[in-house]
């Protein structure tokens, strides 16, 4: 469906920002698809973007105090750094966000450390900068580094760590 004032189906971005926040609007616009293609607006999908950001926020309460990457999450973190880096370079924001969603699901399944959460915050920062800066402050990273999350260097992946150290197989 094409948006048009004459059809009365235009979405006012101010209303979306007021209801869900600027980061949700920003994330949703980047998630709905390629910038060069027509995309269909979906209020339900906007709510899904908000749920994803809420899930990221709630990870702060789950993270253990370790600054190291957890063994269970190390491979998915390095795969995600590789994927998000490549996708941003190719302006494929939707697939970069999808990779972050997959990683967050793994964090919920495996648990996470503060080190794992820090990697998520750094990769999520271009998509939800306001929320990430709040998280950066609340997790003590701002005090520890003396910088904002957006001032940190982009994380680098180690190709050798993109493969899981062990695989469980049903017999």
Specify the residue positions occupied by each region the protein language model found:
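Active-site and channel-lining beta-strand-loop segments
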Residues: 1-8, 167-171
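Helix-rich, typically C-terminal accessory recognition domains appended to large enzymatic cores
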Residues: 15-171
């Amino acid at each position: 469906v094409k948006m048009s004032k004459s059809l009365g189906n235009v979405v006012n971005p101010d209303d979306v920002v007021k209801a869900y926040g600027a980061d949700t609007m920003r994330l949703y616009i980047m998630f709905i698809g390629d910038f060069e293609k027509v995309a269909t607006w979906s209020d339900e999908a906007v709510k899904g973007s908000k749920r994803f950001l809420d899930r990221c926020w709630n990870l702060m309460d789950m993270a253990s105090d370790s600054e190291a990457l957890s063994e269970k999450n190390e491979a998915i973190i390095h795969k995600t750094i590789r994927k998000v880096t490549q996708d941003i370079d190719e302006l494929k924001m939707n697939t970069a966000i999808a990779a972050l969603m997959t990683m967050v699901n793994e964090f919920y399944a495996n648990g996470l450390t503060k080190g794992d959460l820090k990697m998520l915050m750094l990769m999520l920062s271009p998509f939800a900068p306001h929320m990430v800066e709040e998280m950066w402050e609340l997790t003590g990273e701002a005090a520890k580094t003396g910088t904002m999350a957006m001032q940190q260097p982009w994380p680098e992946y180690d190709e050798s760590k993109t493969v899981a150290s062990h695989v469980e197989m049903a017999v």
